[in-house]
Structures are given as structure tokens and as C-alpha cells.
Regions:
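Conserved SAM-binding loop and adjacent beta-strand
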Residues: 17-19, 32-45
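A generic structural signal for short
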Residues: 15-16, 35-36, 62, 87
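N-terminal auxiliary segments of SAM/dcSAM-dependent transferases
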Residues: 1-25, 29
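S-adenosylmethionine/decaboxylated-SAM
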Residues: 41-137
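Glycine/charged-rich beta-loop-alpha catalytic/anionic-binding loops adjacent to active sites
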Residues: 29-31, 56
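A generic, residue-level signal for flexible/boundary positions that often mark functional hotspots
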Residues: 7, 32-33, 112, 116
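N-terminal start-of-chain detector that recognizes signal peptides
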Residues: 9-12, 31-33, 85-87, 104-106
Length: 137
């Protein structure tokens, strides 16, 4: 049986992602430079599509970093007519960084920022949620 060429598969999947806003590209470049793990454009676009398909209005994200995945979810929520994406991160500087990116993208108005331990923030935030995205260890 032939081996899977993962780079060919990855390149194909990347080719399916529509052009991204300059701010998202800036976030991707920052992540690469700092070696900060993000979901990347293929997974981001997939999350966006899932949120759009189910008409998600309430999304809770556990472990949001500097807001890359939040940006994809917030885009979907905006296009779904509004709602809220809960961004959680334990570091206030990272939360401020995320707020800056999401403001630049015009999506901050649908994001609630939590500077807290993610699971505890989830416990304290009333649901229901259409999506709970777990991006923590």
C-alpha cells in the first residue's frame, strides 16, 4: 500500500482555504516567529465552517491564546447574526493582545474576554453553548 504524503495533503487542504484578512495572516506570522501553537488556517477555516453550518451563536473556547481560533469563531458568529464567543486565557497580556487583533478584525463586539483558568471560567459562565472548543492540555 502506498504511503500517505502528508505534505501533499496539507498543501491541498491549504489551497481550499479562501484568502485570509491581513490581520489573520499577521497572527499566523507571529505564531510562526514565536513558535506559539495555533490551529492554523486549515483547522481555523474548518471551525468556521462548522460554526456556520450549525448557526452557532454561543461558543466557549477553552485555551484561546492570542485569539487566532477566536477570530475564526467570531467571524462565524457575526455571519450567523450575532452572539458571543468566550475567549479564555490565563495571561492578561495575552488577553490584551487578543483584544487588539479581534478589534482590528472588527470582531471584538461578539467576544467576551475571560482572564482565568479555562475550566473554572466555563463552570462560572452560564450556557447553553452551541460549541465548546477544548484547546487546552
Amino acid at each position: 500500500m502506498p504511503e500517505i504524503n502528508y505534505q501533499v495533503v496539507q498543501d491541498f487542504l491549504v489551497s481550499l482555504v479562501p484568502p485570509r484578512e491581513p490581520e489573520l495572516q499577521k497572527m499566523e506570522e507571529y505564531a510562526a516567529k514565536k513558535r506559539f501553537p495555533i490551529i492554523g488556517p486549515v483547522c481555523g477555516y474548518y471551525c468556521y465552517q462548522l460554526a456556520r453550518m450549525i448557526n452557532a451563536k454561543s461558543i466557549f473556547e477553552l485555551g484561546s491564546g492570542f485569539g487566532y481560533s477566536t477570530a475564526w469563531f467570531a467571524k462565524a458568529v457575526q455571519e450567523n447574526g450575532g452572539g458571543v464567543v468566550h475567549h479564555t486565557v490565563w495571561d492578561k497580556d495575552m488577553s490584551k493582545q487578543a483584544q487588539g487583533h479581534l478589534s482590528a478584525l472588527g470582531r471584538a463586539e461578539v467576544v467576551e474576554f475571560h482572564v482565568a483558568e479555562a475550566v473554572e471560567a466555563l463552570r462560572q459562565t452560564p450556557g447553553p453553548f452551541d460549541i465548546i472548543f477544548n484547546d487546552i492540555d
